[in-house]
């Protein structure tokens, strides 16, 4: 049996509440900048949740023509923006046949803005006034399809739709596709744009969102004061490539995706398993596949949403997979304290964070972690970034429906 091929990352792209290019994003993440503020997209006077992490500096016209903008939902625009950055940096297009280049790009929800505007038009003007493009604009696979069209990716264009684990599952399944020889390179990631009235109302009414008015007291992962997550939005894109193909063309390599774990709690629609069992198994799978020796220096970019149940369950999962002692030694932070919860984009953006940690040795913080919850007794990087030599990075993603995904990253 052939040895599985190694998969590396040769391009990164981001659209986020902390910046819509890599340099701005990374500076703000490591400086501990909060990307959360009052919602500006609509009047929130009737909503309990009034803050979100909105993308502020994205210009879709930089990536799309006027005609294309009219035919794409905002979530797909974010996806194309991030993908263009990653593909441009990697230089992958033209280095391999189109049928060896694939796309794995997902969204937790899809074109919610399009759905909302379409329903409003239906109610106000009747069925004949509903756009003929509403279906292709709203479906969650269209970002993958549009990216494939843009770069002639004929290997396959698969979306992951696993709620908050979407970005991580898209990357993980892309890794498996390359490892087993079905493709030589894949554009992978996730995107979301659901800060619209329906999205906010739905999450508020299920009591998932923080209702704090102060942006600096809203997203509080692992803090005893935490009371819900803050909605974010944006996209993250990575170009994944077989190691020898990347080396042969002299590509810059950020790091290797050395492990992937994917499990399901099979427990509850929205709540994590109370003992963190599914998350524990996903972490353990990623560690085993990555060849973790037990004495390596770890950084974990936690799912860390800031909900009471999630953070406690994830703590159990981390300690369950690593053991009590090692689980308390690994450096842990949640960048959702700054970006909010980017939902389907979260795993992709947090994978980018892990790769930048390996490259720079700078570990970003969990900001506003002022009262650590004793139940979440991990080695938190609180308030300010730290310099550390890291051997192995993990990124955890836990989604509604019981989806759990962990990615592991190493230097090459």
Language model features by range: what are they?
Residues 124-131, 172, 176, 192-248, ...:
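Glycine-/small-residue-rich "gating" segment that lines the acyl/pantetheine channel
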Residues 1-68, 244-254, 352-366, 410-412:
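ACP-dependent fatty acid/polyketide chain-elongation machinery
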Residues 23-30, 113-127, 177-180, 200-213, ...:
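A glycine- and small-aliphatic-rich helix-loop capping segment at beta-alpha/alpha-beta transitions
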Residues 79-90, 143, 170, 241-243, ...:
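Short, well-ordered amphipathic alpha-helical segments that serve as non-catalytic structural scaffolds
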Residues 6-10, 34-37, 214-292, 298-299:
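Condensing-enzyme catalytic core mediating Claisen C-C bond formation in acyl metabolism
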Residues 267-279, 305-322, 342-349:
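Short glycine/threonine-rich loop-to-helix capping motif typified by GTGT followed
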């Amino acid at each position: 049996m052939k040895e599985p091929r190694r998969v590396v990352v040769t391009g990164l792209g981001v659209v986020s509440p902390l910046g819509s290019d890599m340099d701005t994003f990374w500076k703000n993440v490591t400086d501990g900048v909060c990307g959360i503020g009052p919602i500006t997209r609509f009047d929130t006077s009737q909503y309990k949740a009034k803050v979100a992490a909105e993308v502020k500096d994205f210009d879709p016209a930089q990536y799309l023509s006027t005609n294309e903008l009219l035919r794409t939902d905002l979530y797909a625009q974010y996806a194309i923006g991030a993908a263009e950055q990653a593909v441009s940096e990697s230089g992958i297009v033209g280095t391999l046949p189109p049928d060896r280049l694939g796309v794995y790009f997902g969204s937790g929800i899809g074109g919610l803005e399009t759905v909302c505007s379409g329903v409003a038009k239906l109610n106000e003007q009747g069925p004949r006034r509903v756009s003929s493009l509403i279906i292709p604009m709203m479906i969650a696979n269209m970002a993958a399809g549009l990216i494939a069209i843009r770069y002639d990716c004929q290997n396959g264009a698969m979306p992951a739709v696993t709620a908050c684990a979407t970005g991580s599952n898209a990357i993980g399944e892309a890794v498996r596709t390359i490892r087993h020889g079905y493709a030589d390179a894949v554009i992978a990631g996730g995107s979301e744009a659901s800060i619209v009235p329906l999205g906010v109302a739905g999450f508020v009414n299920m009591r998932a969102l923080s209702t704090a008015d102060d942006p600096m007291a809203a997203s509080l992962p692992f803090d005893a004061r935490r009371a819900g997550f803050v909605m974010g939005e944006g996209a993250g894109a990575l170009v994944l490539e077989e190691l020898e193909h990347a080396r042969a063309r002299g590509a810059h390599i950020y790091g290797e995706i050395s492990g992937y774990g994917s499990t399901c709690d099979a427990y509850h629609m929205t709540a994590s398993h109370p003992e963190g069992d599914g998350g524990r198994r996903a972490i353990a799978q990623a560690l085993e596949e990555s060849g973790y020796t037990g004495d390596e220096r770890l950084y974990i970019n936690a799912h860390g949403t800031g909900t009471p149940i999630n953070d406690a369950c994830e703590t159990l999962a981390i300690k369950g997979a690593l053991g009590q002692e090692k689980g308390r030694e690994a450096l842990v932070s949640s960048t959702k304290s700054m970006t909010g919860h980017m939902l389907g984009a979260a795993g992709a953006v947090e994978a980018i964070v892990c790769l930048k940690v390996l490259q720079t040795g700078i570990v970003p913080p969990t900001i506003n972690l002022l009262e650590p919850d004793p139940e979440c007794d991990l080695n938190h990087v609180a308030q300010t970034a730290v310099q550390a030599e890291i051997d192995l990075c993990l990124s955890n993603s836990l989604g509604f429906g019981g989806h759990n995904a962990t990615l592991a990253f190493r230097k090459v």
